[in-house]
């Protein structure tokens, strides 16, 4: 596919190419990945200014997102990518595989720095989700800071760099400029811009920004950080679709394939796939992709948690921005609630008018809803502008109407629809079907028949 950058994307690409260190503060779904890959390509093959690039990302992003995006666009499809994940031996093998770009998950940054020590080979580093380094006491921050002088170029990507307050900015900016703008020590930064807040005698529990601190900090970092507001994206459509590929683990993929094969073959060799049997089979395959299936006793059994992990990473990357999450099955809801309990977010299931009012009043961080319960009549545009589809629905009408709960008159920001798509599963069929609009239902049937035929031929 040919990549024609929007004006703001071209500006960001130019900043990466021209500046040795830059932080890009852009909403998810606005193209940070292709912006960065295009800049990497220009620096490596257009200007010959970088040799080896390291991308540090959340685990599920490291597994699939960058690889899928590189394969999608013609201008960067030639970039060789090595994924540094798995056991120690697999990671070492990946590091010694010839490539242009190496991708590692943030949990292994400490290991990577220790592995190379002073023989650090990456002259360009991209921190995808820079806020992962917001804690100046964390080992991963200290590890990256220790080898910062060996890095010629550093790019920090995030949607919201300071989800918990201005103090989060120090460590991220330090990695960019090694203390030039906000100081070389966190204590000095805090003394300059903050004053003690909640305290008990000599013990200070929190610090509050001094008057004018926010403006002073933003002015200090404005030359090294690109922060864009919604008005900067005026050229974009009012609704943006953001597909997030989810790579299943090897075991999860095997389990999915075996269960899919069993379900298909249980139909029998001479069974004609009609609407009823197709709906039942598609329903089960959708459950498998989401990570759980109903059991005969009315309960459910978890098959994998890869999509749940990707969902939590997505929530983390939103950095407190409110989102409505659409689920399909009861076990989706149960698993989402359990996963979200580990966060400090205010989570609510959409059940009554009170939930609707609280969402629109900004009192709810994550609103869990079934698309059928929001199809008509609800106005949810005041509570946020992010939609997350944990599992897609084959009904184009339900899909469009659910998205319109936020994408409607009164919405002050562009709506971004995030869709979690498990690779190699029924998810991919549904995503393609929804793009076909009027032909969606026929494609749902055709794609299912293709899966059935594949397994029957293998017998």
Language-model features: where?
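Conserved, function-defining core regions and hallmark residues within catalytic/recognition domains
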Residues: 285
């Amino acid at each position: 596919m040919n990549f024609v950058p929007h004006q703001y994307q071209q500006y960001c690409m130019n900043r990466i190419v021209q500046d040795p260190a830059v932080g890009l503060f852009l909403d998810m779904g606005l193209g940070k990945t292709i912006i960065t890959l295009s800049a990497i390509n220009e620096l490596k093959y257009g200007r010959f200014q970088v040799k080896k690039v390291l991308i540090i990302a959340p685990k599920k992003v490291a597994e699939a997102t960058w690889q899928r995006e590189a394969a999608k666009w013609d201008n960067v499809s030639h970039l060789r990518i090595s994924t540094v994940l798995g056991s120690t031996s697999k990671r070492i093998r990946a590091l010694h595989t010839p490539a242009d770009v190496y991708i590692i998950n943030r949990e292994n940054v400490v290991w990577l720095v220790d592995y190379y020590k002073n023989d650090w080979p990456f002259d360009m580093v991209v921190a995808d989700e820079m806020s992962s380094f917001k804690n100046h006491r964390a080992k991963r921050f200290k590890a990256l800071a220790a080898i910062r002088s060996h890095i010629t170029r550093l790019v920090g990507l995030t949607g919201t760099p300071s989800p918990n307050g201005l103090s989060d900015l120090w460590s991220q900016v330090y990695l960019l400029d090694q203390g030039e703008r906000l100081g070389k020590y966190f204590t000095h930064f805090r003394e300059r811009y903050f004053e003690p807040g909640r305290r008990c005698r000599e013990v200070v529990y929190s610090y509050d920004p001094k008057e004018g601190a926010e403006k002073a900090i933003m002015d200090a970092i404005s030359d090294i950080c690109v922060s864009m507001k919604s008005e900067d994206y005026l050229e974009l459509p009012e609704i943006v679709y953001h597909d997030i590929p989810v790579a299943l683990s090897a075991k999860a993929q095997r389990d999915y394939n075996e269960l899919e094969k069993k379900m298909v073959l249980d139909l029998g060799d001479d069974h004609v796939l009609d609407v009823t049997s197709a709906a039942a089979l598609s329903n089960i395959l959708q459950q498998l992709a989401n990570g759980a299936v109903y059991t005969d006793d009315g309960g459910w059994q978890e098959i994998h948690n890869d999509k749940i992990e990707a969902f939590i990473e997505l929530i983390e990357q939103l950095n407190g921005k409110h989102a409505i999450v659409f689920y399909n099955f009861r076990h989706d809801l149960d698993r989402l609630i359990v996963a979200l309990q580990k966060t400090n977010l205010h989570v609510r299931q959409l059940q009554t008018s009170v939930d609707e009012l609280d969402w629109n009043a900004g009192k709810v961080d994550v609103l869990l809803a079934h698309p059928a319960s929001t199809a008509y009549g609800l106005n949810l545009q005041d509570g946020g502008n992010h939609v997350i589809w944990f599992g897609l629905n084959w009904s184009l009408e339900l899909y469009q109407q659910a998205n319109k709960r936020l994408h409607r008159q009164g919405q002050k920001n562009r709506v971004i629809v995030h869709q979690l798509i498990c690779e190699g599963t029924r998810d991919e069929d549904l995503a393609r079907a929804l793009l076909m609009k009027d032909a969606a239902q026929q494609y749902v049937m055709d794609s299912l028949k293709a899966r059935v035929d594949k397994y029957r031929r293998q017998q």
